[in-house]
């Protein structure tokens, strides 16, 4: 019996000796990727709170610059024709001006491009909230076969072959391999600088300038806040010291009903599988809303007037319609004032967020 045990033990030893060694990543948890440069402050403009920043991705000048370059670079798509900015461009309030976005090889998305402007304040990203952070959001479109049609590995391989990019990654994160985690963190750092406030509303509401808004916009603000009128602030929130104009929650308005009266897009339900979330979509911010037509998650409303008229009608009735969506009793003047107020939410666009890959035309004297 002892001899048999010895042979078994010897066999186990030989088996273990022949087995492949565990990968380094399996032996030791991978060290977190973190920028190495000096942390910079992202200053929030009038009307907005401090910008939320994750502990593992503090903003640095190097990561912001790298993220800005990546954001505008078509290298992140399979045929190099689509960049992040293709669907989220400053000329359209960091959307794209289309009902649904164009993808690679003639593909079409199924939803309106969410605005990137002030997305730093969203607790969940995408219309359905499937990404918990800007970093995770930056992972999605690249690998979507319709949007950018690439793989994370393919992006990394392409960037490794670019000596300029490799040097910029090393400068931002320290010497080491280029990874998609670094790509996502750089893009997210840049997007946290894409914030806009100091609008006529902000100067009126928080800056003490009572002449900053027109009389029509001031009347529209009252319609916006009044629960018996627009009741808009119920979801598009205004706080004492700042205004995000979003409750960061999900609501069913009945947008996107098909000819059979069915919801064509299940929205938040696809993530939660909770019946109450059927057809519910994230409340978008209204900041710079005048710049980002068309509207709603499917881009079905071309103008702010169409949006207001939709709410006046009480949305589209369905089993899961949000309890706060009710027909509004607004006069034509109140409707027009409400639109004028929303136009007063157009804020100051910060410098340094346009395409760094495009050389500015020389100014002729």
Q: Which residues does each predicted region cover?
A:
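Bacterial N-terminal signal peptides that target proteins for export
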Residues: 1-8
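Low-complexity, intrinsically disordered segments with a bias for serine/threonine
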Residues: 10-13
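C-terminal motif of bacterial Sec signal peptides marking the signal peptidase cleavage site
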Residues: 16-17
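Short, conserved catalytic or interaction motifs in soluble domains
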Residues: 20-21
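Short glycine/threonine-rich turn/loop motifs
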Residues: 28-140, 202-302, 306-312, 316-319, ...
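Generic hydrophobic/packing signal
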Residues: 120-123, 138-142, 159, 163, ...
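A gly/proline- and charged-residue-enriched helix-loop-helix capping module
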Residues: 145-149
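C-terminal capping alpha-helices of c-type cytochrome domains
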Residues: 152-197, 290, 300-365
């Amino acid at each position: 019996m002892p001899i048999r045990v010895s042979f078994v033990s010897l066999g186990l030893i030989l088996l273990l000796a022949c087995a492949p060694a565990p990968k380094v990543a399996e032996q030791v948890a991978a060290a977190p990727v973190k920028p190495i440069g000096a942390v910079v402050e992202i200053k929030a403009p009038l009307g907005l709170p401090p910008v939320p920043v994750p502990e593992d991705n503090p903003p640095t000048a190097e990561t912001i610059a790298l993220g800005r370059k990546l954001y505008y670079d078509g290298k992140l798509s399979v045929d190099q024709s689509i960049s992040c900015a293709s669907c989220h461009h400053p000329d359209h309030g960091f959307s794209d001006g289309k009902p649904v976005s164009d993808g690679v090889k003639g593909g079409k998305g199924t939803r309106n491009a969410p605005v990137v402007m002030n997305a730093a304040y969203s607790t969940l990203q995408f219309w359905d909230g499937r990404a918990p952070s800007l970093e995770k959001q930056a992972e999605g479109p690249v690998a979507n076969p319709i949007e950018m049609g690439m793989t994370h590995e393919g992006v990394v391989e392409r960037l490794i072959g670019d000596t300029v990019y490799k040097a910029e990654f090393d400068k931002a994160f320290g010497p080491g391999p280029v990874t998609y985690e670094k790509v996502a963190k750089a893009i997210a750092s840049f997007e946290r600088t894409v914030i806009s406030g100091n609008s006529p509303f902000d100067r009126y509401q928080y800056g003490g300038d009572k002449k900053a808004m027109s009389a029509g916009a001031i009347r529209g603000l009252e319609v916006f806040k009044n629960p018996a009128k627009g009741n808009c602030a119920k979801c598009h929130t205004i706080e004492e010291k700042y205004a995000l104009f979003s409750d960061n929650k999900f609501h069913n308005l009945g947008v996107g009903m098909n000819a059979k009266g069915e919801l064509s897009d299940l929205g938040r339900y696809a993530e939660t599988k909770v019946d109450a979330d059927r057809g519910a979509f994230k409340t978008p911010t209204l900041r710079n809303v005048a710049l980002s037509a068309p509207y709603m998650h499917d881009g079905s409303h071309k103008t702010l007037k169409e949006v207001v008229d939709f709410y006046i009608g009480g949305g589209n009735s369905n089993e899961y319609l949000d309890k706060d969506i009710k027909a509004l009793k607004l006069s034509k003047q109140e409707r027009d004032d409400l639109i004028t107020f929303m136009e007063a939410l157009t804020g100051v666009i910060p410098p340094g967020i346009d395409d760094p890959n495009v050389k500015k035309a020389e100014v002729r004297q």
